Amino acid sequence: ENARACREAVQGSKRSREAQAGETSPAQSLAAWHEFAGQYFPALVDRPAVVHGGGVLLPVPFPQTNLHVLRAGVFVGSVQKGRFVPEHHLFTAFGAQCANCEQLTLADPRTTEYLSGREVEARTAADGWCCVTVDGWPLGGGKVSGGRVKNHYPKALRLL
């Protein structure tokens, strides 16, 4: 059942990326990514990025073999309504490099709240996008506004 929910979430996000692909040029997508990365992920600004399927991908060098590669890189986000919107993959892969983090602990009740898809109080992150970490490990992302972390944890992964 969880596998089905994950497939549906991936297919749904793929459909939304494909629908938005015609709205933004690759150059605009890369410019939006570089602006976003400069603010929240400065260590990633100089990494090569490519636009694929309406989204921005940070490719990983991979040797040419006969292996079928599902994803040779990290899908970091896409441009929606003129703004760069980060994906969950960005925060889980590069969360340790995020300049704005909401730090939780395993014993913190906000951890369960976040994993359940609810907003949590922001204690360590400033306004804007942030990586939510638990004991230093990246869990996902959110957007801080008015002292609250607006939850962007994927619905298919949430606790019920």
Give the role of each language-model region:
Residues 3-160:
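Polybasic, low-complexity RNA-engagement segments
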